[in-house]
Amino acid sequence: VRRAELLDRHFPRRSELDFARTVIERGLGLDLTAEGRIHLDLEPHQGREIGVRAEAVRVPDEVHVVGRPLGGVGDAEALLGALGRALAAAHTDRTLDLELRMLGDEAVSAAFEVLFAGILHERSFGERRFGADRELYFERASLLDVIRLRGIAARVPIESDPEGIPADARVAGAASAALGLPIEAPVAWLELDPDRGASTCLRGFALAAVLRQELRSTFGVNWFESRRAGRYLRDIWSYGRRYDAEELAREVGANGLRWDLVREDLVGSSA
């Protein structure tokens, strides 16, 4: 399901960067590299892990997007997500104190990653991109989001365990119960991301849903093709981590994080 080989023809190998450039520069009117502050290193070096991630070294002046994309829809989503995170860091107001540029609430950065990776999930975008395969794509996207959210939710009691690192049996049991499938311990451990806590990931999803609704209501369902939306995002990114996820949600007009919007997005993707 993650690899989605049947959809590969829509994203030939080595086409991910051109696709991302089209979305970010032609659609939103943003510079992919943020005037050189974002450094791209996507060459297939030996030993480099598969996938793409963003790493902020000096915010906002040095942000790296690194990895080894193999092609296909999954890597296209991952690259867009990494660039969403990178653009947020690279547009942070440099006059902010260090703790407001690089520390603070990680859920805010996670939200921009989820928001950009989810551009392909937008109905109007996906229908044009995938054509006759659009329903296959939307079903896959919705299923993966459900799997991911349930897997993250399963980590909450594990990470709050006062006894420390849980045993294999407990990890496997929690993952299996969340997904409704028998998950062996080695696979379950892969889902435990030591750099991002479960609550951070969940709050990132919720903030992304709030931002997505605001973008749609202000700039239309094709917000990802609006340069005004790009300027709006740039203004929000300038805040850095001045606000936590709940505060930023209120700053853009919501009454805090909206979990109902997360559910609506899941239902909408599969509608």
Residue positions per predicted region:
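Contiguous, non-catalytic segments that form substrate-binding/exosite surfaces or channel walls
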Residues: 1-73, 251, 263
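Active-site-adjacent bridging/hinge elements
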Residues: 51-64, 82-93, 128-134, 175-185
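Helical catalytic core of nucleic-acid polymerases
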Residues: 90-137
